[in-house]
Structures are given as structure tokens and as C-alpha cells.
């Protein structure tokens, strides 16, 4: 974009995405400058629980595509509904009870457990995140949108 090269990265631990980062370079052979996390409003800093796959340009706009290996534990965090689907909610509550955590009192830790429950993962159900990549002062930014148009 604008003659600059952007790099969107993350890692994985099991099937859980790790924090993501964006970097920029005028010349990729001379290295990149890290810009930090690109997802705004994502407490996990993991591009909304996805791993960057690619960015494509469509009609002058850039679209972020990310793999999401654990959709059953992720989507509910960004829809405004504070609860996952009933089956997932039951699995999470069982795990919290096993760990001696109260979902209200230990909310932050409970969210971490819910997000990181690899044993609830069925990767054949993996899905994707498609979001418009926005720009603020030469910096790529992702914001969760339940619905959007080109």
C-alpha cells in the first residue's frame, strides 16, 4: 500500500492463535519496523482469535482473511451476546468447576479458560474471519464488524 510493504503475523500454540503483530518496511531487504497489534477492541490481541492467512485488495479496499481453528469458542466473544452456544457453555462450565473457578468472581481467568480450551476443538469445523482492513496514519487496523459491505 502506498509503496510500503506490510507484514501481518501471529503464531500458534496448539490450535490457539498467539498475539498478532503488524510490521512495515519501505524495503523488505532492509528489515521491518514492528507496529504492534493490529486488532482494536480485541482483549485477546489475537486478531479476533484468528491467524492471518492473507490480505487481498478488492475495489481499492483491503480485506483481511484469517483462519479460525476453534470457532465454537470464539465467535460469541464479539457478537454482543456474552454467552457461547449451549453445548460450548456446558463444556466451559464443567471445566471451570473442575478448576475451582467462579465465572463471575474469576471472570478474567474464566475467559482465558474458555478461549484456550483446546480439548473442545474439532478442527474439521474451522472457519474464517473476513474483515475490512482499515488504515490510520499508515497503520493497519482491524475492528470487529458483525456485518459490513465493500
Feature-to-residue mapping (PLM):
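Carbohydrate-active catalytic/glycan-binding domains of CAZyme proteins
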Residues: 1-150
Amino acid at each position: 500500500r502506498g509503496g510500503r510493504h506490510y507484514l501481518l503475523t501471529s503464531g500458534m500454540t496448539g490450535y490457539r492463535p498467539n498475539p498478532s503483530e503488524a510490521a512495515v518496511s519501505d524495503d523488505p531487504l532492509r528489515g521491518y519496523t514492528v507496529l504492534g497489534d493490529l486488532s482494536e477492541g480485541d482483549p485477546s490481541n489475537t486478531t479476533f482469535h484468528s491467524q492471518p492467512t492473507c490480505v487481498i485488495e478488492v475495489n481499492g479496499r483491503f480485506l483481511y482473511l484469517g483462519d479460525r481453528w476453534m470457532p465454537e469458542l470464539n465467535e460469541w466473544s464479539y457478537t454482543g451476546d456474552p454467552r457461547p452456544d449451549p453445548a460450548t457453555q456446558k463444556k466451559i462450565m464443567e471445566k471451570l468447576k473442575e478448576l475451582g473457578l467462579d465465572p463471575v468472581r474469576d471472570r478474567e481467568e474464566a475467559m482465558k479458560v474458555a478461549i484456550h480450551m483446546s480439548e473442545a476443538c474439532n478442527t474439521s469445523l474451522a472457519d474464517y474471519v473476513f474483515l475490512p482492513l482499515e488504515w490510520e496514519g499508515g497503520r493497519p487496523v482491524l475492528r470487529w464488524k458483525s456485518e459490513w459491505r465493500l
